[in-house]
Amino acid sequence: MFGKSKQLADQNAALEKQLQPLLEMFTAMQSSLAFIEFTPEGVITKVNDNFSRVTGYSSAELIGQHHQLLCDKSEVESSRYRDFWKHLNNGESFSGEVLRKHKNGHDIWLEANYFPIKDSEDRVVKIFKIANDVTARVEHARSNDSLLSAIDRSMAIIEFDMKGRITHA
């Protein structure tokens, strides 16, 4: 009996030793990234402080609400949105930039990774999302694109022949 207890204690200590670096990594990630967890149906079950900060909603305001709360109405009504959740429920992950709505109504861009979590019977039991606010980067890129487009539209193009005469203006 005592030998079995010693063996279990040793196994437990070994597992704790393996788990420690994972806990440290998770803690580091939680301090800098936004985390949110959903049911397979899209109901919010957990958020971290970073997610609340990025969206403007407190955890109490988010938990129990559907993912739709964070999306534009036109997106929610789209077939693309239904397909997005269908793919997640089929166990397919998603990574990319997504447009979401802040509590005050302004647009926020997130670099998001959605991970379906499965049980031992291969059923999706929850969806885990890790996100980073990239709004400033996306808006800066769009501003640059608009500026370059305006320059392209306003530039004059003049063609000359070999003698310097204008052939097309």
Model-derived features: positions:
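Sensory coupling linkers of modular signal transduction proteins
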Residues: 2, 9-12, 120-121, 125-153
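Sensory modules in modular signal-transduction proteins
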Residues: 16-47, 142-169
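PAS/PAS-like sensory domains
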Residues: 32-35, 77, 87-97, 111, ...
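PAS-family sensory domains
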Residues: 45, 89, 94, 99-108, 118-119, 167
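PAS/PAS-like sensory domain cap-loop motif
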Residues: 51-63
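PAS-family sensory/regulatory domains
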Residues: 63-75
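Sensory-domain boundary capping and coupling elements
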Residues: 112-114, 131
